[in-house]
Each structure stands twice: as C-alpha cells, then as structure tokens.
Amino acid sequence: EEKLLIYISYDLQKFSSSAIEKMFSSATEAKNSGYKIIGLTASSTEERNSFIKNNNLFFEFYTCDETALKTVVRSNPGVIVLNRGTVKQKKHYNDFSDLNFN
C-alpha cells in the first residue's frame, strides 16, 4: 500500500472520547490526502463492530494479538503512518493532531 494509516488499540474500551475525536479528525484528513485507513485491535468482534457503529467510523478494525499490538505501540490508542511499507510517523493519541499527511 502506498499510503497507509493504521490506528492501533489493543483494547477499544479504553479509548477515551477525546482520543476518538482526534482519531476521527486525523482519519478524515488522511482520507482526503489519499490514505487507506485501517485499525488493529485485540478486542472482540462484537466490541469492534459496536465501536465502529457508535463512532460513525468509515474504516474497519482487524483483529491482532494483544501482545503483538503492544509491541508495535505502547500507547492505547496509537497510530502509525506508512508510505510503501516504510514507517514515516508513529504517534501517541495525544499527538494525533500533529500527524502530517503530505
């Protein structure tokens, strides 16, 4: 994938409302800049589907092992920006607004 934004949350129930707002805003900006957006979580299918529906998200979350997700990013949630498989940015949820999609 040329431009990929991955939100990582090993536990979707620990997503704060302010983090959700920051995620939605940065995801919208990324989408408008041509990025494919996905999420990775260790949460159950029911929790995932509920989270997507309740927050009007326009991208999917996929399942991954919790330990693997914690290895990738320690914050819950966190985000990684990839360009052709190369990590360009890795941020804590407090810094979602600092993401650069150029």
Q: Where is each model-derived feature located?
A:
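Short active-site neighborhood of thiol/selenol oxidoreductases, capturing the structured segment around
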Residues: E1-K14
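Structural beta-sheet core signal
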Residues: L5-Y7, I37-G39, V81
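Cofactor-binding loop segments of dinucleotide-utilizing enzymes, especially the Rossmann-like FAD-
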Residues: Y10, A42, R84
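Short, flexible loop segments at the rims of nucleotide/cofactor-binding pockets, characterized by
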Residues: L12-S17, F58
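Structural microenvironment flanking redox-active thiols in thiol-disulfide oxidoreductases
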Residues: S17-F51
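Short, internal strand/loop/helix patches
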Residues: I37-A42, N54-N76
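A short, hydrophobic beta-strand/beta-hairpin element that forms part of a small beta-sheet core
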Residues: P77-K91
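A short, polar/charged loop-to-alpha-helix boundary motif
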Residues: N94-N102
